[in-house]
Amino acid sequence: MVKSRRIILTVLAAVMAVGIYAPIAASGDQPKLAQVVYITLTKACGCALTACQAGDIVVGNVFNGARKALLKRVDYSTNKEAAKVYIKKYRLTQAPVLLFLDAKGNLLWTKAVDLDEKEIADQLSQFGG
């Protein structure tokens, strides 16, 4: 009885170790950025509109030249259906928001409301954008 418990615990520990360390080993393969989705509002009240207008400037400054091809801009005010796909899938609650996605649509990074040029540029560099 004691021996079988030890075997079970040893097997369980081995399985847990593989589960814990396998993602760390795989994390050396950094996912590649395929698309950046920017969800904003052109019609909103007060501070929401101000945040979105500021976000528009930041996104415009960061996504220029070759980087512009990565960006998909979705305006909730004029294209609710397209925005709702992302809102539902990624459980978004604030605007403006940037979504960094890989080729399979997996979320790599997100940033909402207070968009910062340096932080976004750093994340672009990290994911190869």
What are these regions (language model features)?
Residues V2-T10:
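N-terminal Sec-pathway targeting helices
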Residues L9-Y21:
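Hydrophobic membrane-insertion alpha-helices, especially the h-region
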Residues V18-Q30:
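Bacterial Sec-dependent signal peptides at the C-terminal "C-region" and cleavage site
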Residues G28-G65:
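Local sequence-structure signature of Cys/Sec-based thiol-disulfide redox active-site neighborhoods
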Residues L70-A95, L101-G105, Q123-F127:
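Thioredoxin-like thiol-disulfide oxidoreductase module
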Residues L115-G129:
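Thiol-/selenol-based redox modules, centered on thioredoxin-like
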